[in-house]
């Protein structure tokens, strides 16, 4: 019933109007799984390769026909007759067939789409929801939790066309008792933020991840207007709502000069000075999590930042670790950061993603499940967050259906699981338990 009889790939469109790979895996029992690969804007240099055609006459070079050739050709042929329930074997076949360190032959976008579609097909064959199947693959059958959302309500950096250097300013509805209540609180702050921005004459157009993208006087002003919105929504900052930031600092790091250049503010920092700048912000605002607070190659700087802030703040590695167990192990061994961002297209398969989550948890690091700035209606990360009991999720703001699709799937899962999937709020954040 769970043998693969057909694998199909197609080119679909993501939330930025760019092509991406969607795959279907068909099983002999008539079960079908379908999944799409997301795409990042601020990407780590050590991520698995997203294969694009480079043909400027199609989609400005961003077509994925080469990746589809891999899905519909060698991958489909290699997987015929294989048992979809053996996810590790399915993923390993594709990895071995590709034969490169960074999946550059077939593309991580090709391998991941098939990997996730396979998991969905296997879940269907087993007659269980995807999150339950993921929990079994993870070796934690029946262990679930609802993740605390990090909601990106002001977008800057590579996610917006504005003067804000820091890429994401997020709220966490820690005062909520359930995921559904957290979503409501986030929506209320989001709508009040629109009012606050309008009252100041600021633009309320949104960026790639559905957050507002106004020009602001400083990065600190982003936190100030969010604080106003939280109060206007009737919530207490630091009690009901905490704050988080994704600096994506590699995007404003000058490797030659070894400087961090906040062009929007006209300020330049050394590595330790930028960590001190962030530390100062944490004394003025209830910031409990900082992601990619330095360049991905600035390991000495991260050691300093972790030492200075790591006992009270969650220090998340995204570009730093790129969901890669080899790089994460180096971080763990050297006391770098205390949390990893999980993006399965950075590594390119479900099995490798689960391995990164397990390694992080075993080392006492937290794992934050994340979307990419280029998304589709595919909501697999919601099931991944619940099925691994990861505890935290980043999936954008309260607008754009590519973001809201994940929140809606979480609401459905919470309704189905009830007390079996507790919402632990701030306890999930490193340094806050």
Curated annotation (Swiss-Prot):
Q: Where does Mg(2+) bind?
A: 246, 291, 318
An example of a Pfam family matching this protein is: Enolase_C
Enzyme class comes to lyase
**Any one cellular component term from GO for this entry?**
extracellular region
Q: Name one GO molecular function term.
A: magnesium ion binding
How many cofactors are bound and how? Binds a second Mg(2+) ion via substrate during catalysis.
| Keyword Magnesium listed | yes
Task: Report the principal subcellular site.
Answer: cytoplasm
Instruction: Write the Enzyme Commission number(s) for this entry.
Output: 4.2.1.11
Residues bound to (2R)-2-phosphoglycerate are 167, 343, 372-373, 394
Q: Which cofactor does it need?
A: Mg(2+)
What positions constitute the catalytic site? 209 (proton donor), 343 (proton acceptor)
The reaction(s) catalysed by this protein are: (2R)-2-phosphoglycerate = phosphoenolpyruvate + H2O
Record keywords? Cytoplasm, Glycolysis, Lyase, Magnesium, Metal-binding, Secreted
Which domain of life does the protein's organism represent? Bacteria
GO biological process terms, alphabetically, are:
glycolytic process
What does the UniProt entry say about where the protein is found?
Cytoplasm; Secreted; Cell surface
Pathway this chain belongs to: Carbohydrate degradation; glycolysis; pyruvate from D-glyceraldehyde 3-phosphate: step 4/5
Q: Tell me how this protein assembles.
A: Component of the RNA degradosome, a multiprotein complex involved in RNA processing and mRNA degradation.
- Protein function: Catalyzes the reversible conversion of 2-phosphoglycerate (2-PG) into phosphoenolpyruvate (PEP). It is essential for the degradation of carbohydrates via glycolysis.
Instruction: State the similarity comment.
Output: Belongs to the enolase family.
| Protein name, UniProt field | Enolase
The gene is eno
């Amino acid at each position: 019933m769970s043998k693969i009889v057909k694998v199909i790939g197609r080119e679909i469109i993501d939330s930025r109007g760019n092509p991406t790979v969607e795959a279907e895996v068909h099983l002999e029992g008539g079960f079908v799984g379908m999944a799409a690969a997301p795409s990042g804007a601020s990407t780590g240099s050590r991520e698995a390769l997203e294969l694009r055609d480079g043909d400027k006459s199609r989609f400005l070079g961003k077509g994925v026909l080469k990746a589809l050739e891999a899905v519909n050709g060698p991958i489909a042929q290699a997987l015929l007759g294989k048992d979809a329930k053996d996810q590790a074997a399915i993923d390993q076949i594709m990895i071995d067939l590709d034969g490169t360190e960074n999946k550059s032959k077939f593309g991580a976008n090709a391998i991941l789409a098939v990997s996730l579609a396979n998991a969905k097909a296997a879940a269907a064959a087993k007659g269980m929801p995807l999150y339950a199947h993921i929990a079994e693959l993870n070796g934690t059958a029946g262990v679930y939790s609802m993740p605390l959302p990090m909601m990106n309500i002001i977008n800057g950096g590579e996610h917006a066309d504005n003067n804000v250097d820091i890429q994401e300013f997020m709220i966490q509805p820690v005062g909520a008792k359930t995921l559904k209540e957290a979503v409501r609180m986030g929506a209320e702050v989001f709508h009040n933020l629109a009012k606050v921005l309008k009252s100041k004459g600021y633009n309320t157009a949104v960026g790639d991840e559905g957050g507002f993208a106004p020009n602001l006087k400083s990065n600190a002003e982003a936190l100030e207007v969010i604080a106003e919105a939280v109060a206007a929504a009737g919530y207490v900052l630091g009690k009901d709502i905490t704050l988080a930031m994704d600096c994506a600092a590699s995007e404003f790091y000058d490797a030659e000069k070894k400087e961090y250049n906040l062009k929007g503010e006209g300020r330049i920092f050394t590595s330790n000075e930028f960590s001190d700048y962030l530390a100062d912000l944490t004394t003025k605002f209830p910031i409990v999590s900082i992601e990619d607070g330095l360049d991905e190659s600035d390991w000495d700087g991260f050691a300093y930042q972790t030492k200075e802030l790591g006992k009270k703040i969650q220090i998340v590695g995204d570009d730093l670790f790129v969901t890669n167990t080899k790089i994460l192990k180096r971080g763990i061994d050297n006391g770098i950061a205390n949390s990893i961002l999980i993006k399965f297209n950075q590594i390119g398969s479900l099995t490798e993603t689960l391995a990164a989550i397990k390694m992080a948890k075993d080392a006492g690091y937290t794992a934050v499940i994340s979307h990419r700035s280029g998304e589709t209606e595919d909501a697999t990360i919601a099931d991944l967050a619940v099925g691994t009991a990861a505890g935290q999720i980043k999936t954008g703001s309260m607008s754009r259906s590519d973001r809201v699709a994940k929140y809606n799937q979480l609401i459905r899962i919470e309704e189905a699981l009830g007390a079996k999937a507790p919402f632990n709020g701030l306890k999930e954040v490193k340094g806050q338990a």
